[in-house]
Amino acid sequence: MAQTQTFNGRRRVRKFFGKIPEVAEMPNLIEVQKASYDQFLMVDEPKGGRPDEGLQAVFKSVFPISDFSGSSMLEFVKYEFEGPKFDVDECRQRDLTYAAPLKVTLRLIVFDIDEDTGAKSIKDIKEQDVYMGDMPLMTLNGTFIVNGTERVIVSQMHRSPGVFFDHDKGKSHSSGKLLFAARVIPYRGSWLDIEFDSKDVVHARIDRRRKIPVTSLLMALGMDGEEILSTFYNKITYVRAGDHWRIPFNVERFRGLKAVGDLVDADTGEIVVEAGKKITARQARQLGEKGLKAIKATDEDLLGNYLAEDIVNYATGEIFLEAGDEIDEKTLKVLLGTGEQEIKVLDIDHVNVGAYIRNTLNVDKNESRQDALFDIYRVMRPGEPPTLETAEAMFNSLFFDSERYDLSAVGRVKMNMRLELKAEDTVRVLRKEDILAVVKTLVELRDGKGEIDDIDNLGNRRVRSVGELMENQYRVGLLRMERAIKERMSSIEIDTVMPQDLINAKPAAAAVREFFGSSQLSQFMDQTNPLSEITHKRRLSALGPGGLTRERAGFEVRDVHPTHYGRICPIETPEGPNIGLINSLATFARVNKYGFIESPYRKIVDGKLTNDVVYLSAMEEAKHHVAQANAELDKNGGFVDEFVICRSAGEVMMAPRENVDLMDVSPKQMVSVAAALIPFLENDDANRALMGSNMQRQAVPLVRAEAPFVGTGMEPIVARDSGAAIGARRGGIVDQVDATRIVIRATEDLDPGKSGVDIYRLMKFQRSNQNTCINQRPLVRMGDRVNKGDIIADGPSTELGDLALGRNVLVAFMPWNGYNYEDSILLSERIVADDVFTSIHIEEFEVMARDTKLGPEEITRDIPNVSEEALKNLDEAGIVYIGAEVQPGDILVGKITPKGESPMTPEEKLLRAIFGEKASDVRDTSMRMPPGTFGTVVEVRVFNRHGVEKDERAMAIEREEIERLAKDRDDEQAILDRNVYARLSDVLVGKEAIAGPKGFKKGSTLSKDTLDEYPRSQWWQFAVENEKLQSELEALRGQYDDSKKALEQRFMDKVEKVQRGDEMPPGVMKMVKVFVAVKRKMQPGDKMAGRHGNKGVVSRIVPVEDMPFLEDGTHADIVLNPLGVPSRMNVGQILETHLGWACAGMGKKIGELIDTYKAAGDIKPLRKTLESFMPANDRNEPIREYDDESIVRLSEQMRRGVSIATPVFDGAHEADINIMLEQAGLHTSGQSQLYDGRTGEPFDRKVTMGYIYMLKLHHLVDDKIHARSIGPYSLVTQQPLGGKAQFGGQRFGEMEVWALEAYGAAYTLQEMLTVKSDDVAGRTKVYEAIVRGDDTFEAGIPESFNVLVKEMRSLGLNVELENTKLDDAPVRLPDAAE
């Protein structure tokens, strides 16, 4: 048995229960963000120039800009980015935006225009680089740093550009008649609606304005009435034959019609169909096959038809009848009178073909193109007199001008597919053919041919990601700039200026800033834990600019649609008003270049499943039959069953196996990342699964993270892609490691131009956006070998590279003295004592010293009227020490502000004149700890404006920072030296040197000892004969010198940044930030939850000895109510409990075997147990090939409990759980005999007990509890404010008043409505009375009564109080004491 593999213990090993092999690699989970923005910026110019997309396309669409006279033109040449001024960490610390300066090369061309001929000749060309503002860059984790905070740009779902056909579902008309409509939606530009009204006339609307007949629109496109009719209708020719007419027999036309009179064959004269009979499709076909060519028609048969052409007297030019006229008795006479031998009529039978366009033409008042253009002009610009030129220009700019109208490539592709056109996707404007095809399709729909579109189908909705949103925003900015440039070009002497003088980049920069700062889609990143970050980046919102609004979104838009399968998660969406409008991308989904969401499928060729994976969008998928991932296969990859369950065109059906051509790649491809983390998801009710997905995102990172015993196999993927855990960029050997960084000497990808050292900085106790703590811990030791992609450091909520949002706790499902009524949770004191659910929270407090009108504010320790006791935590600069324990009301930063001078009395003036200047008044505006917050100061940062003298504290912080930078530089230098000289030594040893330092004998062979005789800096003087080797040495030397220079330069830059002042908001001289960390232990009132939507609030923390315990004395950690399971239907939690129990039992068994191995030295039983627990297959670890040391290391990891993975929809079954319980030596019922901790008596029945994974949620009682006695009041009503943030009071509302009224508590009620609320004078008097120790007071008039009186007066109703004197003194109830 070849035991070749080793296990380093740096990752968690799981037993997989999944049966379905994973073929497709899961795409990087934040690829959506990164790929989109990279495509927009294209920082590095590819060979052959940048393609026309992203930023390049924006510049190309706005430039060239010409002035109004055409005598000069500004062209765009190229753009490039310089390096960002500050790196990511510096931006976070200094509240800056992480951005790179954008340089654009512009070319100004000045023309000479010949006044006589108007010919242009180039007079002058100038090129120049122009700075166009800063462009925010994306961090490696797909976020942006704007003003020091991390933000995410959420992708938006919107209706795809293109054409959509729909009807009103019978709502508009009382008869319930369906009114069909078509809408052409461009990416930008005017919308075109074409719709039927209740009279079956077709109208067009532009931009939802007044409607016009659609024929007017067609006339404006240059068609006349006859052309319109011939486009929409076929013609039938009546040919005169003696006393009757002949009309050709057309099979299609006659099928389904009822014969009014006998149908007679025009050639033979026989009756082929009798009067009153309906002609079926079969009959019509048979008649055609029998050779029926034409049928007889009488003059009467012409009645009711419509003429297809004008009837003209060619001699006089007189028009007798016009095309489209209906033939009635009168017109028939005229017709027969003209003696026409051939009459062409429109093929309209009112059954298969309706007369809608002809009727529309009939009601249309416009006769010519000019009339139609004028009509459209009046609709679009009411009140302006039209001329032909302005009307033509306006009409062309609506749909046919690429600057005003853009269908986009997507729109063109969708339009081609829907209307079966063949235009290139570079044709981005409408064409006459497009509009005609839309009208034709709409009329066919009305005639009952074809289907309407489903707007909720994902083939009709697309995703706009960061890059595209940014592109649109930047285009807006550039267009604003364009106007200014045009005006400046016309008003300035163009010969003397450079492009720089014409451009003011402010509008463009402002558009970017506005988008990142205040757009609805630019959101403050949810950084509670790594899962919430990843989910936020994968979110799809239907809200936002150009999207839906909460109020207007109906039920259909929010609902799950069959096309969501594998694209959008049907489970994860918020509860509340946004339900269904905010969605999450499914695990394997990706967004294609047109913005449609694609899902992967495996191909089935000739009935055999292949490993070829294709990505299809919803439109492409509709044509296929897709089998589920869990369909049963034989060993050759064919389907076992004759009929297979599959999806086709949105329906689930049983199809013969020959018809199935695709299969899902994985059972978890239909759910999102958060839902894929829930084990036994298939056993949970969907509503609870939704809560479970959402609550995992609120789990607070704990001090000790612990991965779940029962996972799904998704945990390492989330930890890796979120960037919380750090993976090695390339393989190598760990050279140095401490808490703040890891240094790895690379052994692969050794590029001569690159440094051979990778340094990974770890984040230590950083504050996240949600005030949770971000802390990374190294997993490697010095000398460890690592491979590319290995996890070398854990982050918040990760353990050994696995996502670890909570802890495994021992749960008993039983009632316990009513303390778990209504989902409450009973905890053991052990949880608190052992810091199981303890988390660290960091708050940031910021204080600014400004320059005020009365003088500058000052940060100082010298604060008026403050005792020395209150200043004990401050240093001489007035800033709190690091490590100080602070509580509510403590001063963090002392600050004084100049007070306004009060006017002086003459006496004061005299005294001041005699005794000189008295110190001007200052008031204390120090920053104090807010109520209800305790903690320890962990970090202080001081920022000074340029040129403001730094205080002692700022200097100390600066010195520490520079020392840290110097240490980093020295360490890097040492590693670089060691690395380079090791490589140099490898090249030189054993070679013959032809030159060397002083005292070296030429021609001798170099050895390690020879080299050691000389200082390392002299080794470069050795030369070898082999030219190739010698050039390698020189290259190494050059690389070494360059690296050294770069290192020093980087150090100098950073020191310079630290020493120079900081950029501050206007008026701010100095800013201090204090970070206070607090350890939050579990306490009653905190919210906890499992992964199955089983949430509850901690009701009581009980001493360990009172908790129920097992026979061996193990106490339960947590007691949950069994009644929380049946009605909620989330049975997954019970299965998880059983499996967790088996995991712990197995771990205990392995632990005992390790102990025996350590005592007796026989590893075979341990190896055997591990091999039987984890049988060899392609998903499990190859335990057979492990050496003994690895087996022990693995067993130590499993001691607390083994880890298993049960993937969603492909997880462990009941039988698997039973087998595992048996392996662990436990009862297969999963129930145990428990004993009451207080009496020691056994409980009557056995109790389900096991390990469940519980999370502590970010709803902590400390952040919610709040009390007030006196605080701020609202200015108008003088009532106390509301809410904890405003330090408000409790509202005594309408219903509470009723309660006091019901009890007859008159005085209490009076106090509530007056002195405890808004009786201003009364509440002051009460305060004074209490201070005096007196308890008599009177209630006055509430301020809200005065507000009411004033509001009535503002309506013109004068309300006055009658001041009649009350004779009697106010009644006072005798005190009980009297």
From Swiss-Prot:
Keywords: DNA-directed RNA polymerase, Nucleotidyltransferase, Transcription, Transferase
UniProt keyword annotation of Lipid metabolism present: no
InterPro entries attached to this UniProt entry: DNA-dir_RNA_pol_bsu_ext_1_sf (IPR042107), DNA-dir_RNA_pol_bsu_external_1 (IPR019462), DNA-dir_RNA_pol_su2 (IPR015712), DNA-dir_RNAP_su2_dom (IPR007120), DNA-dir_RNAP_su2_hyb_sf (IPR037033), RNA_pol_bsu_bac (IPR010243), RNA_pol_bsu_CS (IPR007121), RNA_pol_bsu_protrusion (IPR007644)
Top-level taxon of origin: Bacteria
Catalytic activity: RNA(n) + a ribonucleoside 5'-triphosphate = RNA(n+1) + diphosphate
A Gene Ontology molecular function term of the record: DNA-directed RNA polymerase activity
Gene3D superfamilies registered for this protein in UniProt: 2.40.50.100, 2.40.50.150, 3.90.1100.10, DNA-directed RNA polymerase, beta subunit, external 1 domain, DNA-directed RNA polymerase, subunit 2, domain 6, RNA polymerase alpha subunit dimerisation domain, RNA polymerase Rpb2, domain 2
Biological processes per GO annotation: DNA-templated transcription
Enzyme Commission number: 2.7.7.6
A Pfam family of this chain: RNA_pol_Rpb2_3
GO cellular component: DNA-directed RNA polymerase complex
HAMAP family: RNApol_bact_RpoB
Summary of the function given for this chain in its UniProt record: DNA-dependent RNA polymerase catalyzes the transcription of DNA into RNA using the four ribonucleoside triphosphates as substrates.
Family, similarity comment: Belongs to the RNA polymerase beta chain family.
Quaternary structure note: The RNAP catalytic core consists of 2 alpha, 1 beta, 1 beta' and 1 omega subunit. When a sigma factor is associated with the core the holoenzyme is formed, which can initiate transcription.
Protein name: DNA-directed RNA polymerase subunit beta
Taxonomic lineage of the native organism: Bacteria, Pseudomonadati, Pseudomonadota, Alphaproteobacteria, Hyphomicrobiales
